[in-house]
Amino acid sequence: MENTSNPEWCANLEGDYEISQVEKLTTSTLVCWAYQISRGMEYLASRRVVHGDLAARNILLTDNNIVKICDFGLAKNIYNNPEYKKSVKIPVPVKWMAIECVVDGIYSTQSDVWSYGVVLWELFSLSRTPYPEFANFDHIRNKLQSGYRMPCPPYANQYL
């Protein structure tokens, strides 16, 4: 009889591995993940889909370091129009959004590119929250409109 108390799908529960088994995170691993995310987003753009919520929290990683983009709850098909204007007011992840999304509610593949830049910042800061010094929507919007950009993340070198 098979032991079903720890099925294969939950093999990564907290405490089921030893620290010595965990691989060290390297720059090449982060670059590999960044590349895979870019290819996934390139595929979505080729299918005329705007993700609308690209963030590190919406990236899954398989056992063999394959990246999967997930959470398509805010995704839109832009097959007939290269932009999507959001008309319904719902809570959105402002810190990951392009200026045109925050100010005008306009989403496009270019706004996904902005979000990808924030994901890169998350990767190379080892999952720090973007814009940690800004607490509210108005402050972020005003700073971005005045030209503010996040500084280089701590673990990115000049070549990245």
Regions of interest found by a model, annotated:
Residues 1-160:
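Intracellular eukaryotic protein kinase-like catalytic domain
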